[in-house]
Structures are given as structure tokens and as C-alpha cells.
């Protein structure tokens, strides 16, 4: 069985915020490429992993109905907070860098 994976408007805004932060820190064209690759990795990993095995990842501490997907990238990575809405749909609610303390 395959799940449809959607990103909420908040998750989309989080990706934009993370991308903007990386752009602000960029010194070289390689840094710009890395920023784009990071966002693409988050999108691709969430789509692939959550479409197939959304029940496999840890439950979120603040809400047991939600789960968190760890997305490695470079030396750290990202965390996607998501909820399984139905037997066929998963919604990514928020995304943060692993070094951030909370989602918002």
C-alpha cells in the first residue's frame, strides 16, 4: 500500500525559511548548490519514505498522533513532523533543522 504525501503550507514555509537561511550563509556557488540540494533531499526523502512506511518512524513527544522522520544531510540533517491522516494520506506538518530546538 502506498500513501499520498502532502506538505502543509506551514511545512512549505519552513522549507523556504531553511533555504533562505542557507542562502544568507552562502559564500560560494557550492554553498548555493548545497542549499538547493538540502531542500531537494528533504522533499525527496519525505515523499519516498512516508509514502511507503509512515508507521516506522518515532512518535513525536508533544503529540502521540504525530511522528517524526529524521532526514540525514551532511553532518546533521532535518526533522519532518507529520501525521497519518487516513489509510492513504500523510501530511507533513513542519520541518526543522536538527540543531533547532523546536518547530516554531
Where are the regions that the model predicts?
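Basic, Lys/Arg-enriched alpha-helical interface segments
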Residues: 1-67
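Enriched for short, Lys/Arg-rich terminal
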Residues: 70-104
